[in-house]
Amino acid sequence: MPPKPADKKPASKAPATASKAPEKKDAGKKTAASGDKKKRTKARKETYSSYIYKVLKQVHPDTGISNRAMSILNSFVNDIFERVATEASKLAAYNKKSTISSREIQTSVRLILPGELAKHAVSEGTKAVTKYSSSTK
């Protein structure tokens, strides 16, 4: 039997907000239970696999590569990238600059890679930057 109007207690603010919260939860349940399930998109994993494969085909057109070898090379590229970026960041901080330029990248490559490998990397990097600069103009 419903209570008489005289028996009702004056409403306080706490129960009013408490009664609103379940309504919001119910609204959330209704949308979930309605069957409008969105198909989850698979998280894209960024790798260097396609680039590694292209370089492999330039150097050895008739040679393939296993998934395990590709994974190892991808880890290697990520590791070198992280080392160069960290070193370039330190160099920029030492020189009180907020921007990493090609000069910091070049210096960090010289510091990280040994001897002849550093020379080849710097020359290839310079060639790539020159090619990019000429194509954007």
Swiss-Prot record:
Transcription regulation keyword on record: no
Q: Name one Pfam family in it.
A: Histone
Biased-composition ranges, Basic and acidic residues, are 1-10
Q: Where is this cross-link: Glycyl lysine isopeptide (Lys-Gly) (interchain with G-Cter in ubiquitin)?
A: K131
Q: Where is the protein situated, by its record's location annotation?
A: Nucleus; Chromosome
Keyword Aminoacyl-tRNA synthetase appears in the UniProt entry: no
Q: A single GO CC term, please?
A: nucleus
- The protein here is known as Histone H2B
